Amino acid sequence: MLSMFMYNNIIDYVHVHDIEDEASDNDDRDYVYPLPENMVYRFDKSTNILDYLSTERDHVMMAVQYYMSKQRLDDLYRQLPTKTRSYVDIINTYCDKVNNDYNSDMNIMCDMASTESFTVYDINNEVNTILMNNKGLGVRLATISFITELGRRCMNPVETIKMFTLLSHTICDDYFVDYITYISAPRDNAIHSTREYLKIMGIAVIMFATYKTLKYMIG
């Protein structure tokens, strides 16, 4: 099972020679090569992007990838309707607060996390199990933050997009949709809104306690 997947380091893909070595060590002539969607991705301990930009070509390619990705996202945002943009603002606000208020907790969990091998589907299965057992907003906001952090540290953009697409479907269940639409609705009573905000963020405390038990729950 996946252990502490939502923390730590760079995901790297299995090199072709790794697969070839595995095949050569297997006496069975019917060896089946892994399908691309089932490829195993490994966390590496390095989080310094300079470790992956060793040549001038690496730097130039990264610049091109950044430009294309930024243009795509900027264009996407311009096309979003007003309602969707308001949801973007809400998610920005709440996830940023989770990141800021519980930064030390995240660092502790990153230190606790061990190097593991897994697929995007392993990640999705673990997240789905956690969300089925926790109906609160906090756990969903924190999951978004964790998956986003994985994406930041992933050197495989194709796998990152796949992970974001799959996990967004899993995270956006009926509970999360109800929470976001409730928060976005106008409130006549500012005090009520503040209390609701604090109540919702308080759930994040329980959420972190849940995640901290994962290393004991998931073998």
From Swiss-Prot:
GO terms for biological process: regulation of apoptotic process; symbiont-mediated suppression of host apoptosis. Pfam families: M11L (PF11099). Keywords: Early protein, Host cytoplasm, Host membrane, Host mitochondrion, Host mitochondrion outer membrane, Membrane. It is found in: Host mitochondrion outer membrane; Host cytoplasm. It comes from the Viruses. Its main location: host cell. Induction: Expressed in the early phase of the viral replicative cycle. Disulfide bonds: none annotated. One of its GO terms (cellular component) is membrane. Belongs to the orthopoxvirus OPG045 family. Plays a role in evading host innate immune response by inhibiting host inflammasome activation. Interacts with and inhibits NLR-mediated interleukin-1 beta/IL1B production in infected cells. At the host mitochondria outer membrane, interacts with the BH3 domain of host BAK and prevents BAK from binding active BAX. In turn, host apoptosis is inhibited. Homodimer. Interacts with host pro-apoptotic protein BCL2L11 (via BH3 domain). Interacts with host NLRP1. Interacts with host BAK. This is Apoptosis regulator OPG045.
